[in-house]
Amino acid sequence: MERFEGKVAVVTGAGAGIGKACALAIAREGGRVVVADLDGSAAIACTAQIAAEAGNALAMAMDIADAQAVAALFETAERHFGGVDLLVNNASAMHLTPRDRAILDLDLAVWDQTMATNLRGTLLCCRQAIPRMIARGGGAIVNMSSCQGLSGDTAQTSYAVSKAAMNMLSASLATQYGHAQIRCNAVAPGLIMTERLLAKLDKCMQRHLSRHQLLPRVGHPEDVAALVAFLLSDDASFITGQVVCIDGGMLAHMPTYADGGNSCAGRTAGDTAETARC
């Protein structure tokens, strides 16, 4: 029997990247998936791929910062599939990160919008999912955090704080609703080469980032999706309230770089001074 046979999952931010990989992974193991994304066309494309693989999915265009839209999302999931068993809170205000700066340079509108999506939106989804999970005898939630929620950075203040708060939200949910057979964990990815990230990085920067991974490769959305699927499944039935890093060892080593600059420490044989600066 497939791990998610008979289960209904809601995945937010599922039109691309990690969210899409999670939706596909759940569907491939028998789950019925509600694919939610701000970009409706991306959500439809994801459901089309699931359907092409003989899966069952429903696309919804919505903004998780909108409480009414979130309520409609879960009402639709219940009406269409009969309930909700699994939730992946992956949607994030990534479009704001170029303007998400150090504290004194930070536009408070960026802070407010980031918190509205990353934190409040996650809370809204959890509040809609929990009663429906209780009605079905329990469920599992994975909140998509980040390694940036576990260590300081020279910029992206709002994003990092929102992810740190998400970690505590996950622990609080696990504590408050474990008696109802609801598990909640956070997943903290490191450098994951999504299509969106690859489009922003030139070859030189890709080389620089790859050089500072402990493993001889970068992460991919499918790596994160495999972890998420495990945490949602009965294979992880005694795991709850945890923040699980999937970062290729990014946070396991020293030194870190307080100025955000480049290092020659990872220079490999054959690198010139110029390529080391890349």
From Swiss-Prot:
UniProt xrefs under Pfam families: adh_short_C2
Example GO molecular function: oxidoreductase activity
Class of the enzyme per the UniProt entry, highest EC level: oxidoreductase
Residues holding NADP(+): 10-34
Binding-site positions, substrate: S146
InterPro entries from the UniProt entry: NAD(P)-bd_dom_sf (IPR036291), Sc_DH/Rdtase_CS (IPR020904), SDR_fam (IPR002347)
Keyword Oxidoreductase: yes
Positions annotated as active site in the UniProt record: Y159 (proton acceptor)
Source organism of this protein record: Sinorhizobium fredii (strain NBRC 101917 / NGR234)
Keywords assigned: Oxidoreductase, Plasmid
Designated name of the protein: Uncharacterized short-chain type dehydrogenase/reductase y4lA
Enzyme Commission code(s) on record: 1.-.-.-
Family membership: Belongs to the short-chain dehydrogenases/reductases (SDR) family.
